[in-house]
From Swiss-Prot:
Its main location: nucleus. The gene is CYCL1-1. It comes from the Eukaryota. The keyword Cell cycle applies. One of its GO terms (molecular function) is cyclin-dependent protein serine/threonine kinase regulator activity. Belongs to the cyclin family. Cyclin L subfamily. Forms a complex with CDKG1. Interacts with MOS4 and associates with the spliceosome. SUPFAM superfamilies: Cyclin-like (SSF47954). SMART domains: CYCLIN (SM00385). This is Cyclin-L1-1. GO terms for cellular component: nucleus; plasmodesma. Cognate cyclin for CDKG1. Required for synapsis and male meiosis, and for the proper splicing of specific resistance (R) genes. Involved in regulation of DNA methylation and transcriptional silencing.
Amino acid sequence: MIYTAIDNFYLSDEQLKASPSRKDGIDETTEISLRIYGCDLIQEGGILLKLPQAVMATGQVLFQRFYCKKSLAKFDVKIVAASCVWLASKLEENPKKARQVIIVFHRMECRRENLPLEHLDMYAKKFSELKVELSRTERHILKEMGFVCHVEHPHKFISNYLATLETPPELRQEAWNLANDSLRTTLCVRFRSEVVACGVVYAAARRFQVPLPENPPWWKAFDADKSSIDEVCRVLAHLYSLPKAQYISVCKDGKPFTFSSRSGNSQGQSATKDLLPGAGEAVDTKCTAGSANNDLKDGMVTTPHEKATDSKKSGTESNSQPIVGDSSYERSKVGDRERESDREKERGRERDRGRSHRGRDSDRDSDRERDKLKDRSHHRSRDRLKDSGGHSDKSRHHSSRDRDYRDSSKDRRRHH
């Protein structure tokens, strides 16, 4: 059972060894490499997005916590790293738009995969799919965290510890760098931030050969123990001995950030080798690349016979032609037509919106004119009523006065 509270999320060594990724057949070396790769993506993406270091640190902690509960085989490292950056930017009150995050990670993947830098069309179907996937993964992270995303970093303890120990100033930057590197490991889910801070201070002091008080032991003043500090130093030393982390495709539903087919070819070829061991001997490299291109959309590997059937149905090749001779070219043409149709649909929607807005404006103008005409006719009728009503009252008033005067004159005559 993983203990989760407002300010901690810690696992034992046994729980870490029995992670969901291990249960799905991913070995320890691959899991460590992919965790480091994802944290590198978060750090580089945050720098390109011009985010403060606190955002990258929070994103890396969320990344490590998420893969303690979910498997690397079910959630791709790239999309989880992007979602952690997006979520951490909001948690640290430096929000970025989803469009900006997708553009930055698209550029990073192009550079890491040695692909040409392409313009990311925000009206394409691929972009909308990436945006939906980014939001969906963010919801998964929040659900697995129980919406408890409080993170306490070791950085805030380092300055206090070093000031208390009266160490030289160059030790502070070294300890800060070690604290940043510790986030690429599982130390943040194994030890409290105070213990990690003591570990990086101890490692920095040993590197600069700065003596620390041992009688009484200095770590007891900071609520730490010697065995935990030694474990932190051991994990950091192991991290620096590893080669540069590379992406390993272990996720079944991994979606690249690039539109190019080269990154998909590498994934398709690896999947072909795993599923069809003898395919490389029976089919040449051109056929393998063509099959990977044809299966990129569906994410499945098909046989050459199925591809021949599909090409016959589409009518793009004759029965006597090779199976995959022009498959990549035809697929690119189909992709261009799909993009063009998407753009035409978007333009049509914009035109419809403009027409509807213009129609609403014309309706409003006509309503205003109609109201003005009604007001004018109403004022005219009111004026007429006033004129006619005034004269009639006046005539009635005068006639009644005349009548009274006549009656009174008659009475006077009678009295006389």
